[in-house]
């Protein structure tokens, strides 16, 4: 005599339970509504409409901090699109190229093994430039 | 004012929507519907002139239009909700169809997100200050919304202080919230307004007029004597000058300049400059 339920009957009972639970869930029986794309945006703020100046003002040096702020905020608001195209260089391009040239040698020397130090010789100016290429194995021609 | 009123009354009686472009600068009344430029061709006057069919689909060439204060969206049209003059601004950077709004006048302020206002601290409860901004509810201001404020380093704000801040939350469903820093965490002039000075109230339209980029009144006032002014979009102005008399003169000028013509104003300024 079997005490527990049969596996099949168990499955059936589970399925029935699931069905009851899912039918209890509510759903809206409406047709699909398509959201209309609206071309009009509503804004209640006057900031978009009119270019207003910054609200704090000071005249004839009464409050120097506010005068500085006035210049900052009003300039930001007027010249937002003007960008500085001429960026002043601190270091010229040629000097940069020269530095890089010697830099490669200096850093390379740091990682080179003792035997390879011969490759890095200092010339008159003290600039370290790698002179020779590494010695490779040359296969005999025969 | 009789002429624009009669014109408006005629159009309302005819109940025909007018094109927004033709009404720019004229007085509009609440309840009027305005057509946007793309639609006025389709609903052109009568059928007397037959328009040739255009092969390119009109629907694709619609641009986004922003309807500002005083206007609402009603289907595809704009519905006027306040009386005033209709204004339009062309888009600066090319995207969108520009902004339409109604230039109206009112004294009661309704909090709007992003507006800089002057508020008066009315209560201090725990970590929040209640600030009266002239709206239907006092705005809340957290003590952490000041520059350089931490839990240990609290800002020095007492009841009765004047605060210049901006709204971060302001809609009809929630209590307005304001802060005294910008999105980067800098104060930018916001915070507690200093000692002395005089706070008075004017209409909202005057504030916008005074803050316009080419306002002559402000330029002339600035030449009189050293002074400091703070404008709040809620109709409040705070002024301060070296002596009490100068402060009072300034307050009177700003209050009165709304109803003066430019000649009267120039007379008053020249009289002041002499004395």
Curated annotation (Swiss-Prot), chain B:
Crosslinked positions (Glycyl lysine isopeptide (Lys-Gly) (interchain with G-Cter in SUMO2)): 151
Primary location class: cytoplasm
Cellular location(s): Cytoplasm; Nucleus, Nucleolus; Nucleus
Modified residues (N-acetylalanine): 2
InterPro entries: Exosome_RNA_bind1/RRP40/RRP4, KH_dom_type_1, KH_dom_type_1_sf, NA-bd_OB-fold, RRP40_KH-I, RRP40_N, Rrp40_S1
UniProt keyword terms in alphabetical order: Acetylation, Cytoplasm, Disease variant, Exosome, Isopeptide bond, Neurodegeneration, Nucleus, RNA-binding, rRNA processing, Ubl conjugation
Gene Ontology CC: cytoplasm; cytoplasmic exosome (RNase complex); cytosol; euchromatin; exosome (RNase complex); nuclear exosome (RNase complex); nucleolar exosome (RNase complex); nucleolus
Transmembrane domains' residue ranges: none
Gene3D superfamilies linked to this entry: 2.40.50.100, K Homology domain, type 1, Nucleic acid-binding proteins
GO biological processes: CUT catabolic process; DNA deamination; exonucleolytic trimming to generate mature 3'-end of 5.8S rRNA from tricistronic rRNA transcript (SSU-rRNA, 5.8S rRNA, LSU-rRNA); isotype switching; mRNA catabolic process; nuclear polyadenylation-dependent rRNA catabolic process; nuclear-transcribed mRNA catabolic process; poly(A)-dependent snoRNA 3'-end processing
Alphabetized GO MF terms: 3'-5'-RNA exonuclease activity; RNA binding
PANTHER family: EXOSOME COMPLEX COMPONENT RRP40, PNAS-3 RELATED
Subunit annotation: Component of the RNA exosome core complex (Exo-9), composed of EXOSC1, EXOSC2, EXOSC3, EXOSC4, EXOSC5, EXOSC6, EXOSC7, EXOSC8 and EXOSC9; within the complex interacts with EXOSC5 and EXOSC9. The catalytically inactive RNA exosome core complex (Exo-9) associates with the catalytic subunit EXOSC10/RRP6. Exo-9 may associate with DIS3 to form the nucleolar exosome complex, or DIS3L to form the cytoplasmic exosome complex. Exo-9 is formed by a hexameric base ring consisting of the heterodimers EXOSC4-EXOSC9, EXOSC5-EXOSC8 and EXOSC6-EXOSC7, and a cap ring consisting of EXOSC1, EXOSC2 and EXOSC3.
Stated family: Belongs to the RRP40 family.
General function of this protein: Non-catalytic component of the RNA exosome complex which has 3'->5' exoribonuclease activity and participates in a multitude of cellular RNA processing and degradation events. In the nucleus, the RNA exosome complex is involved in proper maturation of stable RNA species such as rRNA, snRNA and snoRNA, in the elimination of RNA processing by-products and non-coding 'pervasive' transcripts, such as antisense RNA species and promoter-upstream transcripts (PROMPTs), and of mRNAs with processing defects, thereby limiting or excluding their export to the cytoplasm.
Disease (UniProt): Pontocerebellar hypoplasia 1B: A severe autosomal recessive neurologic disorder characterized by a combination of cerebellar and spinal motor neuron degeneration beginning at birth. There is diffuse muscle weakness, progressive microcephaly, global developmental delay, and brainstem involvement.
Protein name: Exosome complex component RRP40
Protein source organism: Homo sapiens (Human)
Gene coding for it: EXOSC3
